[in-house]
Swiss-Prot record:
Keyword Transcription belongs to the record: yes
Pfam family, one: bZIP_1
Classification lineage: Eukaryota, Viridiplantae, Streptophyta, Embryophyta, Tracheophyta
Protein's name in the database: bZIP transcription factor 68
InterPro entries, per database record: bZIP, bZIP_plant_GBF1, bZIP_sf, GBF-like, MFMR
Organism: Arabidopsis thaliana
Coiled coil regions, renumbered to chain: none
Covalent link Glycyl lysine isopeptide (Lys-Gly) (interchain with G-Cter in ubiquitin), residues: 154
Subcellular localization, as worded in the UniProt entry: Nucleus
Assembly mode: Monomer, homodimer and heterodimers with GBF1/BZIP41, GBF2/BZIP54 and GBF3/BZIP55. Heterodimers with BZIP16. Interacts with GIP1.
Gene Ontology MF terms: DNA-binding transcription factor activity; identical protein binding; sequence-specific DNA binding; transcription cis-regulatory region binding
Annotated region (Basic motif), positions in chain: 297-316
Chain intervals with Polar residues compositional bias: 356-366
Biased composition (Basic and acidic residues): 1-16, 137-149, 206-215, 304-318, 372-389
Ranges annotated as biased composition (Low complexity): 19-32, 170-205
Length: 389
């Protein structure tokens, strides 16, 4: 019982091998069947999803407010890995495949370096580096599954070389094609069977184009039977990096290490050309004009600085002259005020002396003043008595 189960499990784990293909279109058909089988398997898993809904149907959109929240099954706690033997979570059957979070509608093979076949303009499916090699020149079929990872890596490198244009150099015959298979177009006769991409075969034909009609005929026959792999099959969004190349015979401007020191150099000093470099007069003329413009700007800046300094000096000198005049006026006023103060002091002293003399005079004659007062008092009394009598 146990041995039979082990044998069954071993048979199930064995991969299903496919017989080697004898035509060049077999890899494309195998690759084109991969996405269809995956889609059919996904449909088989969730083909009866409407009969296993765990929640009641949602009300129409008009009766509830719009909310970005998904269904309540996402609110609860979910296991990262459910225990062994438990059924899957009910949200698997909640929505149809691609119903809630639909994947962008991208056809398989629409982007480079994908495991699916890339569509070509002539209608033939074209794999991007994961198909097995076809029959070689000696007639021996190659094992596609054993060489699959190697060819995939080589295919990516080959496609990268096709993009950056490293394999377009004339005179260098690359042995490996874009998908990793060796090109046998030169050794094949008039069979019409060839493998690999036509990018390297075209390079080989361009480099070996020296009058050999046999090799040219074999390469043309191979390209007629095999799928074309020229630059037209690349995606439209791929752009070839173009590096600017200077024209030969036109020297560039000489390197000058004293560019920053020109500001501190004397007037009219122009940096000389580097020794050993021949500079054309037409090429050096713009640089001379630039240096002249810089010198002119420097001189203008210096002149403006001088003018501003001179104006500031004149303004300060005028201010100093004005202050000196005001100081002289103030000194004259001060001297006049001092003279007036001295005059007032002398007058004050005179008044003090007069006051003291008057005081002495009043203090020396007090009796005379008293007798006069008594006489004046007696006379009104006599007049009053006479009036009464």
């Amino acid at each position: 019982m146990g041995s039979s189960e082990m044998e069954k499990s071993g048979k199930e784990k064995e991969p299903k091998t496919t017989p080697p293909s004898t035509s060049s279109s077999a890899p494309a058909t195998v690759v084109s069947q991969e996405p269809s089988s995956a889609v059919s398997a996904g449909v088989a898993v969730t083909q009866d999803w409407s009969g296993f809904q765990a929640y009641s149907p949602m009300p129409p959109h008009g009766y509830v407010a719009s909310s970005p929240q998904p269904h309540p099954y996402m609110w609860g706690v979910q296991h990262m890995m459910p225990p062994y033997g438990t059924p899957p979570h009910p949200y698997v059957t909640m929505y149809p495949p691609g119903g809630m979070y639909a994947h962008p509608s991208l056809p398989p093979g629409s982007y480079p370096y994908s495991p699916y076949a890339m569509p070509s303009p002539n209608g033939m499916a074209e794999a991007s580096g994961n198909t097995g090699s076809v029959i070689e020149g000696d007639g021996k079929p190659s094992d596609g599954k054993e060489k699959l990872p190697i060819k995939r890596s080589k295919g990516s490198l080959g496609s990268l070389n096709m993009i950056i244009g490293k394999n377009n150099e004339a005179g260098k015959n690359s042995g490996a094609s874009a998908n990793g298979a060796c090109s046998k177009s030169a050794e094949s006769g008039s069979d019409g069977s060839s493998d690999g991409s036509d990018a390297n075969s075209q390079n080989d034909s361009g480099s070996r184009h020296n009058g050999k009609d046999g090799e040219t005929a074999s390469e043309s026959g191979g390209s007629a039977h095999g799928p074309p792999r020229n630059g037209s099959n690349l995606p439209v969004n791929q752009t070839v990096a173009i590096m600017p190349v200077s024209a030969t015979g036109v020297p560039g401007p000489p390197t000058n290490l004293n560019i920053g020191m020109d500001y501190w150099s004397g007037h009219g000093n122009v940096s000389g050309a580097v020794p050993g470099v021949v500079v054309d007069g037409s090429q050096s003329q713009p640089w001379l004009q630039v240096s002249d413009e810089r010198e002119i700007k420097r001189q203008r800046r210096k002149q403006s600085n001088r003018e501003s300094a001179r104006r500031s000096r004149l303004r300060k000198q005028a201010e100093c002259d004005e202050l000196a005049q005001r100081a002289e006026v103030l000194n004259g006023e001060n001297s006049s005020l001092r003279a007036e103060i001295n005059k007032l002091k002398s007058q004050y002293e005179e008044l003090l002396a007069e006051n003291s003399s008057l005081k002495n005079k009043f203090s020396s004659a007090p009796s005379l003043e008293g007798g006069d007062l008594d006489k004046n008092e007696q006379e009104p009394q006599r007049s009053t008595r006479q009036d009464v009598a």
